[in-house]
């Protein structure tokens, strides 16, 4: 039990809403703005919780919203448009989180938790093909390495041609 404002989204809810990247989570978390930002340093995440955050893609600035992947702090939101692949849950904690998560979370924190390997073997593959040769493949597999030792692998491939063909 956590005595704070939190929005938790589990894997089944992510799948049923067809949410595939982090910017789509803001639609179900009040007072949260997550925007995909283009920039010179790669695709960035503009994040603000309760009006506190950063919409500058410069990696020299530290964000006011903390990003954590499996409880490991992600120091910049540059490149922060993550595909929501093979996740157990996503948590959005609103308000200052310095006591719970540490530094750079004065506005709040976004926490991603990966699925853990288990004794149940299996996997999944999702594929999309669309206009301009768009190809999206998302796959994950769970397997046994040795008795009592399990592994999990997941990956994403995204490709799409542009609108214009270069004629040399």
What are these regions (language model features)?
Residues 1-17, 45-48, 65, 118:
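N-terminal periplasmic "start-of-domain" segments of outer-membrane beta-barrel proteins
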Residues 3, 23, 27-72:
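Extracytoplasmic beta-strand/coil segments of soluble accessory domains associated
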Residues 8, 68, 84:
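Short aromatic/basic micro-patch
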Residues 11, 19, 31, 62, ...:
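ATP/adenylate-binding site constellation spanning eukaryotic-like Ser/Thr protein kinases
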Residues 15-16, 33-35, 55-57, 74-76, ...:
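Short beta-strands and strand-coil junctions in structured, solvent-facing domains, enriched
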Residues 16, 23-26, 81, 100, ...:
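A general structural signal for stabilizing positions within well-ordered secondary structure
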Residues 64, 76, 85-94, 99-166:
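Outer-membrane beta-barrel translocator/receptor signature
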């Amino acid at each position: 039990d956590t005595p704070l404002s939190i929005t938790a989204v589990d894997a089944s809810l992510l799948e049923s809403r067809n949410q595939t990247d982090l910017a789509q989570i803001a639609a179900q978390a009040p007072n949260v703005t997550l925007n995909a930002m283009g920039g010179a340093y790669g695709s960035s995440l503009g994040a603000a919780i309760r009006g506190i955050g950063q919409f500058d893609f410069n990696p020299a600035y530290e964000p006011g919203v903390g990003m954590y992947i499996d409880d490991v702090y992600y120091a910049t939101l540059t490149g922060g448009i993550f595909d929501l692949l093979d996740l157990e849950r996503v948590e959005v904690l609103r308000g200052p989180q310095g006591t719970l998560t540490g530094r750079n979370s004065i506005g709040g924190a976004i926490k991603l938790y990966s699925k853990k390997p288990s004794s149940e073997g299996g996997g999944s593959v999702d594929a999309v093909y669309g206009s301009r040769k768009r190809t999206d493949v998302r796959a994950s597999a769970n397997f046994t390495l040795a008795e009592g030792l399990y592994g999990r692998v997941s990956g994403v491939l995204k490709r799409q041609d542009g609108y214009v063909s270069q004629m040399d």
